[in-house]
């Protein structure tokens, strides 16, 4: 037990040490999703705000290292806050074209900007991928952009995912 604590302390100490040449993070495009949405359900106001639940009905995704479909059955849990912003938290699964299933939990905040128009929406997806070809998803930080998908996609959103380097 003492050895484990010492190893943990040494690891934390290494993180705290200043880096010789710290680089600013950059973004690298990972993939784009078109996420189909179903009819929203509004269970009502809670102590935290107005809740809205939107089913994820399917979709597609594609990028340089990954491609596949979005598995129907996920949900987007939204919470309208007193300040006019909406917290979004989507939990769903990707299925790659070679059959690998990957969990996504994607959170963000939608807030009105000047004149009531919405500001660009940024998200922070977290992936749980099995070990192997796609474990890079579990081993990196990501950010996303969220917007309505083109009308030909039906009720859907477009999410562009970027790996933080």
Language model: regions and residue ranges:
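Bacterial N-terminal signal peptides
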Residues: 5-16
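Beta-strand-enriched cores of mature, soluble protein domains
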Residues: 21-165
């Amino acid at each position: 037990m003492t050895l484990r604590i010492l190893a943990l302390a040494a690891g934390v100490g290494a993180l705290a040490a200043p880096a010789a040449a710290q680089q600013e993070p950059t973004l690298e495009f990972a993939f784009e999703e078109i996420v189909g949405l179903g009819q929203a359900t509004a269970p009502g106001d809670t102590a935290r705000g107005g809740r809205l639940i939107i089913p994820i009905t399917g979709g597609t995704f594609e990028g340089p290292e990954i491609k596949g479909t979005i598995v129907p059955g996920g949900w987007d849990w939204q919470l309208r806050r007193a300040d006019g912003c909406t917290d979004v938290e989507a939990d769903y699964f990707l299925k790659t074209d070679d059959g690998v299933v990957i969990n996504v939990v994607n959170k963000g905040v939608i807030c009105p900007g000047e004149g009531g128009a919405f500001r660009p929406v940024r998200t922070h997806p977290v992936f749980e991928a099995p070990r192997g070809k796609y474990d890079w998803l579990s081993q990196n930080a990501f950010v996303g952009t969220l917007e309505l998908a083109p009308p030909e996609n039906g009720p859907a959103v477009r999410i562009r995912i970027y790996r933080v380097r």
